């Protein structure tokens, strides 16, 4: 892989393709999405994958992205961000599901049978565990997943204040890198200058 980024290389070495759970912390645009895609590709054919997003808009973006990635494959990509208590049996036909946190919470509470087929869960923006409105739901979901179906969990974030503690709680290997494709310029802006 001549163009593999440091966070991607570290993730593969940490067991990404062996089904190990990871917490990948790296700057925006450093290649975290490809880490998710590698884990998904590695799983499909053996089980289902879930890509968990905090917001409908991000879900729609990831859905379009993965529709394109899997357009020439036998795998089906689905999106469910709507009414959390609506009928969900139709979701069983998809191999990769892009879900909001609230939708997955509803599916877990309704004991949807096909969830037992899930082998990997990607948690985008996992730092939102610290968010007072979305964090508690995400924490419950991750706890249920770890205890009920024990999937590989891949947490992705650019900003985590306590990565070691979070990785330990997730039972995941922490992978951190600060490489970024564009140099970060820092400065102070005061009084219009």
Indicate residue ranges for each PLM-predicted region:
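Conserved P-loop/Walker A NTP-binding site and adjacent catalytic elements of P-loop NTPases
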Residues: 1-190
